[in-house]
Amino acid sequence: LASAVEWKRKLHGKVTVVSMGPPNFITTIREAVEMGADRGILVSDRKFAGADTLATSYVLAEVISAVHEQDPIDLVFFGKQAIDGDTAQVGPGVAVRMNLPIVTYAVKIRAVDLDDRIVVIERKTERWTEVIEVPIPALLTCEKEIADIPFAPLPDLINALRYEPEMWTMEGPVEFDTEQIGVRGSPTIVYKMGTPALPEAGEVVNAREIGIEEALNFTLDKAEKAGILDVILGGA
């Protein structure tokens, strides 16, 4: 979002923020307006609940396509991945559905040429940084270093307090295919989420204090009780 706002100011454009979630996400939309977004749309309906990345990308692609019909889009910005599912699939899924060129793991926008309809992007890989030129409109999934989050100026703060985000539902303005939304449109279901159990602290034995033989016997006893010796010796 910070990168989108930065380039909006350079090119005298507009930024529209789209989010899919429960009604209380209205607060998040207002925060986006505080940062400089011009328009905010919350896509919210109980029928969208339980959506996996496939169903989510369908809904967002339909909404972004509708926005594009109202006011042509040059760049679509996504984060690299969500902090819950951590899949990094929704951005690429939207790009495929909208038939947009995509650059993932973007760390810098070098140039945007609206006359020649191209954008030049730096993207980070595990081994190096690539510089890629793609035609506009294009979709980017962005690393956090693509831009610094700016301090919101006072006029934007006041505007955000007064702003009423748009709420798009199953009732409109987009007509969604009920077979592709929510649980029905999701081939994957998360049954459980949790944090991994922390391993117990190990026991420390000082061989100098109890002697090598005692320390070795202690270690072998622990290994036998844990079944490690059976694995090493093949059950012998």
Where is each model-derived feature located?
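N-terminal glycine-rich FAD/FM-binding segment characteristic of electron-transfer flavoproteins
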Residues: L1-A236
